[in-house]
């Protein structure tokens, strides 16, 4: 049984880019889909697709993105911040900058998941899910 499905999702992505795998599969949930959608919009992954398996189970297939010149992954580090055992919250004035603005922080707010830049612009705080750079 998985106690932290978000950490499982991030670990699958991390294991995928460390092993130079092109496509990974993640069990579906709404929050995982929103995290993957943010990664796609920010350019960290090349594509994603939601597929049905056996007419009832959903999977998210994620195509990881690699630098075409060096072959290295676009994602250098993906780190879970708020854990089930220790939640990390911040208001919009204390939202951390990841690598001085080069990376992103995914924040769960009352308006849904969003990046740190959008949360600062909308003046909304929330739970810091992860850092990606």
Curated annotation (Swiss-Prot):
What's the family?
A: Belongs to the universal ribosomal protein uS8 family.
Gene Ontology MF annotations: rRNA binding; structural constituent of ribosome
Question: Subunit structure, per the record?
Answer: Part of the 30S ribosomal subunit. Contacts proteins S5 and S12.
Give me the segments passing through the membrane.
none
Q: Which InterPro entries match?
A: Ribosomal_uS8 (IPR000630), Ribosomal_uS8_CS (IPR047863), Ribosomal_uS8_sf (IPR035987)
Instruction: Report which superkingdom the organism of origin falls in.
Output: Bacteria
Matching entries from PANTHER family are given as: 40S RIBOSOMAL PROTEIN S15A
Record Gene3D superfamilies = 3.30.1370.30, 3.30.1490.10
Task: Please list the coiled coil stretches.
Answer: none
**Pfam families, per this entry?**
Ribosomal_S8
The free-text function statement in the UniProt record for this protein reads: One of the primary rRNA binding proteins, it binds directly to 16S rRNA central domain where it helps coordinate assembly of the platform of the 30S subunit.
- What are the alphabetically sorted keywords of the record? Ribonucleoprotein, Ribosomal protein, RNA-binding, rRNA-binding
**Name of protein:** Small ribosomal subunit protein uS8
Question: An example of a Gene Ontology BP annotation on this entry?
Answer: translation
* Transferase in keyword set: no
């Amino acid at each position: 049984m998985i106690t932290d499905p978000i950490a499982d999702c991030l670990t699958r992505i991390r294991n995928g880019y460390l092993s130079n795998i092109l496509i990974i599969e993640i069990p579906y949930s709404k929050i995982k889909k929103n995290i993957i959608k943010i990664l796609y919009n920010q350019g960290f992954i090349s594509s994603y697709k939601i597929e049905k398996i056996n007419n009832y189970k959903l999977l998210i297939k994620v195509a990881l993105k690699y630098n075409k010149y060096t072959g290295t992954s676009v994602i250098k580090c993906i780190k879970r911040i708020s854990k089930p055992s220790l939640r990390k919250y911040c208001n919009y004035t204390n939202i951390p900058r990841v690598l001085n603005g080069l990376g992103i922080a995914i924040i769960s707010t009352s308006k849904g998941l969003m990046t740190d830049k959008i949360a600062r612009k909308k003046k909304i705080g929330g739970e810091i899910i992860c850092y990606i750079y």
